[in-house]
Swiss-Prot record:
Residues 623-723 form the tRNA-binding domain. GO terms for cellular component: cytosol. It comes from Pyrococcus horikoshii (strain ATCC 700860 / DSM 12428 / JCM 9974 / NBRC 100139 / OT-3). This is Methionine--tRNA ligase. GO terms for biological process: methionyl-tRNA aminoacylation.
Amino acid sequence: MVRYMVTSALPYANGPIHAGHLAGAYLPADIFVRYLRLKGEDVVFICGTDEHGTPISFRALKEGRSPREIVDEFHEHIKITFQRAKISFDFFGRTELPIHYKLSQQFFLKAYENGHLVKKVTKQAYCEHDKMFLPDRFVIGTCPFCGAENQRGDQCEVCGRPLTPEILINPRCALCGRPISFRESAHYYIKMQDFAEKLKRWIENQPWKPNVKNMVLKWIEEGLEERAITRDLNWGIPVPLDEEDMKNKVLYVWFEAPIGYISITMEYFKRLGKPNEWKKYWLNIDSETRVIHFIGKDNIPFHAIFWPAFLMAYGKYKDEEVEAEWNLPYDIPANEYLTLEGKKFSTSRNWAIWVHEFLDVFPADYLRYYLTTIMPETRDSDFSFAEFKTRINEELVNNLGNFVHRAMTFVNRYFDGIVPERGELDELDRQALEEIEKAFEEVGELIMNYRFKDALKRVMELASFGNKYFDHKQPWKTAKEDRARTGTTVNISLQIVKALGILLEPFLPDASEKIWHLLNLDEVKKWKFKELPAGHRVRKAEILFKKVTDEQIIYFILNYMGRNNPEGAKMLLEKYYKREDVIKVAKEKFGEESKIILKRIYKDIKLEEGKEEKEMEYVKFEDFAKLDLRVGKIIEVKDHPNADKLYIVKVDLGKEVRTLVAGLKKYYKPEELLNKYVIIVANLEPKKLRGVESQGMLLAADDGENVALLMPDKEVKLGAKVR
C-alpha cells in the first residue's frame, strides 16, 4: 500500500500568515490530504515554523528583543492561525526542537565525512557601522540579472534567481542603509556540482508540473556551483566541528530548514510513542512512500535541487535496525504567486490580507472557497474583494446553500423529516444518480493531479445540477397530486446533498460538517458513496451560508487595512464605494472612534462629513471623583500572543503590580515604554482583551495620527493619586 508523506513549506516565525501564503503552500496541501484521508490512505501531514531564518534575527535586532522571544510568539500565532483556517496538520512542530538540532548537525557531518563539503575563506558582507557580519538577507541592492531594486542578498523576488551580496549592484546594510564592506571569513560550502548529473537524470523522470520541472532543469543546465552552508550569526544551530574558525558560526538556514520536515516527523512519532515509525516515511525501505512537498514558486530551487542534493550528500542512513537511502521527493506541486487587487503582496508595506484578521470577519470556509477558485496553480492570480463577494454570494449562497436548504426544507415540510421511499425512476432520476458517481470519480482524479480549482468547480457543478433537477421535477406541484413521485424527487435530492457533504470535505470542512449534522449522520465520511436509506430521520433545515455584505468588506478594510496601510485602504475604498457609504459604516461600527479612523484614511475629510462635533458635555465633579487615577511605572512589556497591535504591560503601583493590555504597539517600541512613569485608571472594571485580562487603563492623548502617553513631569511616589 502506498504511503504519503505530505509537507507544506515551513513558514518563517517572524510574522503572521497572509492569504498569499495560504493559497500557495497550505490550502492545496490540506485539500490533498483531506481527500487521501477520505480514501483511507496512509498519510502523514507535517509542517512547522522555520525559526532560524535571518528575518528573525533582523526583527529581533530592530525590536530590541531576543530571537527566542520572536519565534515563541509567532510559532504560537501561526499555529493558531492555521487551526482557525482549518488546515489539518497531523503535527505542527518547530526547528527549535532539540531533535532538529541533532539531526541537522548529523546531516552536516555526514556530508563532511563523504567529501561533499569544502572550506573556503571568502569575503563576507560586513557593516562597519553596526560592527557585524551581515547575512545575505541583511544586504539589499539591485539584482544584476533583472535590474530590480531593493532586492535582498539571497534571492531576487522579481526574477527568482539566487543572489549573493557580492553580485548585488550597490549593496548596502538593510539595518542602517549604509554601504557595506567585505571582510574575510571561513565557511563551509556544499559542492553542488557533485550531484548535477544525478539530479538531472532523476528530475527528468519525475512527473512534476511543467513550471517546476522546466525551471530546475534550466538551472542545472546553466551549471551548479558551490553554495555556503554556514553563516556568521549568533542565532541558529552551531556548526558541529571543533575548529577555531568555526566558532560562533551556525548552519545556514537554507541548509537546515528542509531537514525540519524529517525532524518534525521524528518528534511527531516520538510523541505518539512510536519513535521508529518515521523511518517508513523517510527511508526507501520498500519503495512505497511518496514524499510530496507543497510549496510556493519562490521555494522551487531549494526543494527541487538543493534539498535532494542534501539527501544524496548524506548517503545511506544506518542504525541497528535499518540501512537505506533517503526517500527523494516524489512530487513538488509548487504554486505561482497570488496578488492583491493587481499588486504584489508586500509585508513591509502592509499590502496584504492577514489570515487571522480576515477570519475575524469572515468564516474560514469563505476564505478557503475563494482562494481555491483563484488558486495560482499554473500562473499568477489576483485576490479581488469584489470577486470575493460575488463568488460567495452567487456560488456558495445562491447555488450550493440554496439547493441544500431547498431539499432539507422540503423533506421536513412534506415528509416530517423522514427520507421517503424511492419509486420508479425516470431518465432524469437515473441521470442524477449517475452524476453522483461521476462526481466522485472526476473530483478525485482532479485532486490527485493537483487541479484543485477544477475539482471544486466540479463539486459546484453537482450542486447546480441538483438545483436544475429540483426545478425540473417541481415537487411543490407534484406533492399535491403524486406523493410517490414527489418522494422519489426528495429522496434523490437528499442523495445529492449527502454526496455534497462528502465532496466538500477537502475544500469546505465546516460546510461539510454542517451538512452531515443536518442529515443526522454519525458515520465516518468515506470517498465512496453510500446512499441515505429510506426511513432515516434528518434534522430541521438551517441556513448553510450567509451573504457577504458591502458593510462587512468596508469594516474589514477600515478596521484592519486602514490601521496598517491607510493609503492602501483609501485606494480600495475609493475603488469600490462612495465616501458617504464608508462614513456611514464607520459611524455604525466604531462610534466616536470613527472620526479618528476616517481622518487617518481620508486626510482631506472635514469633520462634518463624518460627524458633527457635539457641544461639550460637562461631567459632574462627583462623577469625575469616582475615577481612581494613579501613578505607576512600567516594569515589563510583552507582545500580546493573540493580537498584533497590543502589548501586555506590567505596571508597578507601589503596593501592587497590575497587568494591562494596551494598544500602543504602533506608536512605541518596548524599550521606549520600559521604566516610564504613567497614569492609569486603577478602578476600571477588569476586562479580557483577546484572552488576557486587563486590570486598568493607561491614559494617553490621541489626535488621530499620533498617540502620546500621559506622564508626570517628575518622579513621584508609585501609587500616588492624580487629583
